Amino acid sequence: MGARLGRRARADAPAAPSAGPAPYERRVRWLREIQSTLRERRPERARQLLRLLRQDLGLEGNLLTDILHRNVTFLNLVDPISHDLLVNLARDLQCPKKDHELWKSSDKICRQLIYHLTPHSKRKHHRKTQSSLKSSLQKTLLVGETVDLSGIPLSARDVQHISRYLDTRGVELVVLDLSFTELSDELLHLLLPSLWALPRLTQLLLNGNRLTRAAARELTEAIKDTAKFPVLAWVDLGNNVDVSSLPQPLLVGLRRRLSQHTSLPTIYEGLDLEPGGGMAETTAAVSTWGSAATEAGPEPQGCCAR
C-alpha cells in the first residue's frame, strides 16, 4: 500500500519540482537586473547581462555586428518578437542616445520583453489553478474550439486526464494552448499520441515550458507520418530550454499539411537542430506574433552616429 501511495504522490506532483525555476523565470530575472543596472548608470554590466540573455535564447554573438549580420534572419526564428526586441535593446545599449534617454527607451524594451516572455492574460491577472484545468476538461467542444490550459502547472496525472479528454472529446479541437504549464519532454511524450490523432488541430502552443531539442526531434519524427497531425499548421516552441529554431524537417512537414500556402520561407542557417536542417519560420504563425516580417531587411550597420 505504501508503494501505491508513493506512486500516486509522484503522479500528482508538479512535472519537475527539482529542476529549479523555469527557463523564462531566469530570463526575466536577467531583464529586471538590466533595468536596475541602467538606473544605476552601469551600462557595461547591462550589456554583459544582455549577452547572457541572448545566448540563453539562442541568439548568439557578443557584439551588435554579430547579432545583426550573422543573425539577420532573426525574424525567421521560433520567437521573432523576442529576437526583434533583443536586437533593439542591444542597439540601445551599444549606440546610446542622450544619457537621460538611454534608461527610458531601454527600460521600455525590457518591460515589453518581460511581458512577452511570461504568462499573461488580458482577462485574468491571477495564476490559474487546478480548478481551471478541471473546468476546462469538463466542457463539450464546439466546432473550431480552442482549449486554453496556459499557466496551469501540469503533473503526470494531469497529462493523463488531458489525454483521456482529447481521446473522447477532442474531435472539434482546433487550437490547444499548453504554454507555461511546466511541460517537460517526458510529459509531452505521454501526450503526443493523443495530440497527433486530433483531426482538426491546426495550432499547438508549447512555449514557455521545459522542452528541449529532444522534444523538437520527437515532433519532427511524428510530422513525417502524414497520418499524424493531419492539418497541423503551426507549433510554437519558443521560450523553452534550448529550442531557438524549428528543425527544417519539422517545418517541411508542416508545409506539406498546408500545400495551399506556397510562400512559407525555408531559410537555411548554420545553427540548425538536425543535420542538414536549418532555422526557418512560417508566415502562418500564431496571430499573437502580430505582423512580424517574413523577410529580413537589409543588414543594419554595427553602430550609428547619434
UniProtKB/Swiss-Prot annotation:
Alphabetized UniProt keyword annotations: Leucine-rich repeat, Repeat
Induction trigger: Markedly decreased during differentiation.
Keyword tRNA-binding set for record: no
InterPro entries given in the database record: LRR_dom_sf
Bias kind Low complexity: ranges: 12-22
Region listing for Disordered, in residue ranges: 1-22
The keyword Repeat is annotated on this UniProt entry: yes
LRR repeat segments: 173-186, 198-211
Source domain of life: Eukaryota
Protein's job: May suppress myogenic differentiation by modulating MYOG expression and Erk1/2 signaling.
Family: Belongs to the LRRC75 family.
Name the record gives this protein: Leucine-rich repeat-containing protein 75B
Gene source species: Mus musculus
UniProt gene name: Lrrc75b
